[in-house]
Amino acid sequence: MALQAASLVSSAFSVRKDGKLNASASSSFKESSLFGVSLSEQSKADFVSSSLRCKREQSLRNNKAIIRAQAIATSTPSVTKSSLDRKKTLRKGNVVVTGASSGLGLATAKALAETGKWHVIMACRDFLKAERAAQSAGMPKDSYTVMHLDLASLDSVRQFVDNFRRAEMPLDVLVCNAAVYQPTANQPTFTAEGFELSVGINHLGHFLLSRLLIDDLKNSDYPSKRLIIVGSITGNTNTLAGNVPPKANLGDLRGLAGGLNGLNSSAMIDGGDFVGAKAYKDSKVCNMLTMQEFHRRFHEDTGITFASLYPGCIATTGLFREHIPLFRTLFPPFQKYITKGYVSESEAGKRLAQVVADPSLTKSGVYWSWNKTSASFENQLSQEASDVEKARRVWEVSEKLVGLA
């Protein structure tokens, strides 16, 4: 009976999706009865209730759709901005590292390549040596490009910049790392333009390179653009190592202003007699002064981070290859066990890579160092290495020497 009743009722009427009765169902419904009881009035009430319930449910569905649409419309700008920001960081960063065929430069290139987030342009004097070094270090082939750069020739610096631009790669970070150190030299040697070699390579070559590439850094869309110049504790006379004779001293820059050619001027920045170890230390003071002057002239308008660093004493580096054999033998254990300042090339490379890429090291105008637990900190520079007026004068004289003024 229950099934029969249900069949009679379902055949008697049907309801459209919008909650209204079909016409045929309505007329049939008026004349129907079940078990002698009229269904007309009761069914009318039931269908009115059903119709209202359907309308309420439809209204709720419509309201939810409107709310979802409003939420999407409201969040669209931020989603779009976020996606654009992500697109900026999806590509690998491009970093130029000078002197990347050995020592600190190679260790840095390797550390950056291993992250998978950087493409390293190895700017080196010896192309084949750099290629072999990258392969020996296990750097993936697509993680680096070797390009020729001889910092002892300003023409080579200009040619490197031209070749780099022809490659149509953006420049996101420039690392000025290459250096020459002649601690036992009694007579100066000179660059192609006639500058004393240590200052010519370590300072003037990098100065021209940085000045020419500053526009490329400005044009980068990378989130954190940086220019890093490697300094040295030996040029910082407020440290124990910086007070080991001969100490760095730029004097009144008379030798630099005279061209450092050893002919009509001294080959030393301060105008004194040539001392190979001092020439290196003086060049490092110039590096640190130049970094600070870049910061003052460009950081506020460009957002580029300018920094210098001393990654620790890499006592086994090839930088000391021209020292006497006894020094090369005793210096590493002395640094490792007495001063505790020794770091391996690998560790130093990781520290420099940290200054290249670490989001926590974006402060500009800073000279970074590391403590014995390998934690980075802002170190203080000596009075001369932080002299604002001297930095300005070094900048202006250097511009003239490299042909920019």
UniProtKB/Swiss-Prot annotation:
Which pathway?
Porphyrin-containing compound metabolism; chlorophyll biosynthesis
Record-linked Pfam families = adh_short (PF00106)
Upregulating conditions: Down-regulated by light.
GO MF terms here are: mRNA binding; protochlorophyllide reductase activity
What keywords are annotated for this sequence in UniProt? Chlorophyll biosynthesis, Chloroplast, NADP, Oxidoreductase, Photosynthesis, Plastid, Transit peptide
Query: Which class of enzymes does this protein belong to?
Result: oxidoreductase
Disruption outcome: Lethal under normal growth conditions and light-green stunted plants when grown in presence of sucrose.
What is this enzyme's EC?
A: 1.3.1.33
Question: Any one cellular component term from GO for this entry?
Answer: chloroplast thylakoid
Transit peptide start-stop? 1-69
State where it is primarily located.
plastid
Membrane-spanning parts: none
**Catalyzed reactions:** chlorophyllide a + NADP(+) = protochlorophyllide a + NADPH + H(+)
Instruction: Give its localization.
Output: Plastid, Chloroplast
Any one GO biological process = chlorophyll biosynthetic process
Q: How does it assemble?
A: Forms large complexes including TOC33, pPORA and OEP161 during pPORA import into plastids at the plastid envelope membrane. Interacts with CPP1 during plastid import.
What this chain does, per the entry, is described as: Phototransformation of protochlorophyllide (Pchlide) to chlorophyllide (Chlide). PORA may also function as a photoprotectant during the transitory stage from dark to light. Functions in skotomorphogenesis, photomorphogenesis and throughout the plant life under specific light conditions.
Family matches, as NCBIfam families: LPOR
> Which additional comment does the entry carry?
The presence of TOC33 is not required for the import of PORA into plastids.
Protein name as annotated: Protochlorophyllide reductase A, chloroplastic
Species name for this entry? Arabidopsis thaliana
Taxonomic classification, please? Eukaryota, Viridiplantae, Streptophyta, Embryophyta, Tracheophyta
